[in-house]
């Protein structure tokens, strides 16, 4: 059986800049842009010959704080907080979870893998916990959509 989130579990708090759907203020789902809720094959994730996601510590990029996002991802409207921000104003800084930015379960079948080898970790990925088809990984990411909230404070 697949690992699941236990009651009372605090998923790691992560941030990602994504396009906002104006109809519900939630992230736009997709796998063709770095500003969608999803992962791009061949860019963010490796897909094997069978169409499964390779478990190579790659996945959908996230940060422990929206200020840690690359300045090209932070919307320009936030330049007063992050000087030099050049991201599209059509994106918003979304957050999910509440726990520390440590390796752990984000949601059913998904885990946070923070980058290694840095004293101050400013990046990680949301990756599948086991080998799954690309479509299942995308569905698992999409299933987190309602949990994301805008946080630009």
Please place each PLM-identified region on the residue numbering.
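NAD-dependent ADP-ribosyltransferases
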Residues: 1-153
């Amino acid at each position: 059986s697949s690992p699941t989130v236990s009651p009372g579990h605090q998923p790691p708090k992560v941030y990602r800049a994504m396009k906002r759907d104006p109809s519900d203020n939630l992230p736009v789902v997709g796998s063709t842009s770095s500003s969608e809720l999803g992962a791009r094959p061949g860019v963010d994730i490796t897909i094997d010959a069978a169409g499964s996601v390779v478990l190579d510590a790659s996945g959908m990029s996230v940060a422990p704080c929206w200020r840690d996002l690359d300045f090209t991802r932070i919307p320009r409207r936030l330049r007063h907080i992050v000087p030099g921000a050049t991201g599209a104003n059509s994106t918003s800084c979304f957050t999910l979870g509440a726990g520390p930015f440590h390796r752990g379960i984000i949601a059913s079948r998904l885990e946070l893998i923070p980058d290694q080898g840095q004293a101050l970790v400013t990046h990680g990925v949301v990756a599948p916990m086991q080998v799954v088809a690309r479509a299942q990984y995308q569905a698992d990411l999409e299933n987190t959509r309602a949990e994301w909230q805008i946080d630009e404070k």
